[in-house]
């Protein structure tokens, strides 16, 4: 556990505290999580990991899809325009449909989970060929060459067991575990988050299109 203390006299967050009294029964509510990207603006549940480069993401270029245009970066951790959400609940599953038909050589994009470690699953394009790949804290592993233009990516998080697993599917029914499970670790001040990314190791170029992002938790 970690408590960030700035000692500014305003007060600090606590893990457990007395629930405020209310005058009547109220329904439990939570922030929106799932997104079909049909709106002209991003939902309030989304958070860019850094100040965004607004010329390189769009909800209008291809209606109903989020377009992430790749900027140059060496690794996932350095990627610009990472779009994230807070991890919710003890058990959660995030699934996304990625269209990788517009990738450029050197580009990587997909779904990731981050804290102090950056772990992602996605598609990389090298010398005109597309590969399913894993990226774990800077280490890149090509899994297999893929054809077609769409893939379903999934991350499953278990906060009680401190475990995160990555999956892929070509039909949104049969998901295949990809790589070993890894631990979640607190990092920076934002905590663990799940999100989408696109970057290019060679320069600026290429696009990832995300049709929807589905997030279930308990």
Regions found by a protein language model. Give the residues of each.
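Exposed low-complexity, polar/acidic, P/S/T/G-rich flexible segments that act as propeptides
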Residues: 205-218
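Extracellular carbohydrate-recognition regions
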Residues: 9-48
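Flexible glycan-contacting loops in extracellular carbohydrate-active proteins
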Residues: 175-205
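Carbohydrate-binding surfaces in secreted/extracellular proteins
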Residues: 37, 96, 152-179, 213
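Short carbohydrate-recognition loop motifs
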Residues: 58-76, 130-134
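Secretory/extracellular carbohydrate-interaction modules
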Residues: 73-129
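Short, aromatic/His-centered strand-loop micro-motif at the edge of beta-sheets
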Residues: 135-152
